[in-house]
C-alpha cells in the first residue's frame, strides 16, 4: 500500500493519510506519462547542446541531426555529429552507432557525401542510455510538479514546494552528470573505411 496509495504518507515507523497527494508517487505517476518523442528527446537535445557551449574548435556541432542537415563542406575545421540515444555504442553485437554513423558519413540526405573526412561522431554508451532516459523523465516530472504548485494547479503547501524544488534540482544535477557519462565514445572514420 505504501508504494501505491497517493495520499498515504510514511516516515520511519509512522503512517498517516493526508488530503494532499504524496509528491513521490505523484512524480512516479507523471513520469509514466512523459512522451519520448515530444518531451524527452527535445530535452536531451537541448541539454547535450549546452554541454558543448560556444567555445570549441569544430566547424559545427550537430546534435541528433539527420544526415541531410549536416553540411558537406570543408569549413574551418571538422564537424562533430552527436548521435541520438537510439544509436548507442556497445562492444557487443547490439552496436547501432556504427550503422548510424555510416549512414551520415556516406550520404547527405539522398546525395553521396563528398567530404567524408570532415566528420567525427560522438556516440552514447548503449549501457547508460536507459539510465539517462529514466533520469530525464524524473527531472521532467519534478519540473512539472514545481510548475503546477507555483501556478496553483496542484494544491500543496510551502514545505512541499521546497521539497519539490530540492528534488527537481537534485534530478537536474544527476541528469547533467549522466549526460557527460553517456556521450563518451568518439568515432573517427579511417581512410580505408572512407574509400
Feature-to-residue mapping (PLM):
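Extended alpha-helical scaffold and adjacent linker segments that couple domains
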Residues: 2-195
Amino acid at each position: 500500500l505504501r508504494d501505491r496509495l497517493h495520499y498515504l504518507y510514511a516516515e520511519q515507523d509512522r503512517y498517516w493519510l493526508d488530503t494532499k497527494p504524496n509528491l513521490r508517487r505523484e512524480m512516479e505517476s507523471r513520469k509514466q506519462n512523459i512522451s519520448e518523442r515530444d518531451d524527452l528527446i527535445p530535452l536531451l537535445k537541448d541539454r547535450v547542446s549546452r554541454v558543448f557551449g560556444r567555445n570549441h574548435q569544430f566547424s559545427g556541432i550537430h546534435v541528433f541531426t539527420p544526415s541531410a542537415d549536416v553540411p558537406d563542406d570543408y569549413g574551418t575545421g571538422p564537424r562533430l555529429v552527436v548521435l541520438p540515444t537510439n544509436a548507442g555504442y556497445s562492444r557487443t553485437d547490439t552496436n547501432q552507432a556504427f550503422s548510424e554513423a555510416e549512414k551520415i558519413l556516406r550520404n547527405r540526405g539522398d546525395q553521396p557525401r563528398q567530404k567524408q573526412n570532415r566528420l567525427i561522431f560522438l556516440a552514447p554508451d548503449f549501457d547508460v542510455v536507459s539510465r539517462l532516459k529514466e533520469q530525464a523523465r524524473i527531472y521532467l516530472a519534478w519540473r512539472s510538479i514545481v510548475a503546477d504548485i507555483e501556478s496553483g494547479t496542484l494544491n500543496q503547501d510551502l514545505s512541499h514546494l521546497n521539497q519539490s524544488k530540492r528534488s527537481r534540482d537534485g534530478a537536474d544535477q544527476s541528469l547533467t552528470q549522466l549526460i557527460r557519462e553517456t556521450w563518451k565514445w568518439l568515432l573517427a572514420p579511417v581512410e580505408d573505411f572512407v574509400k
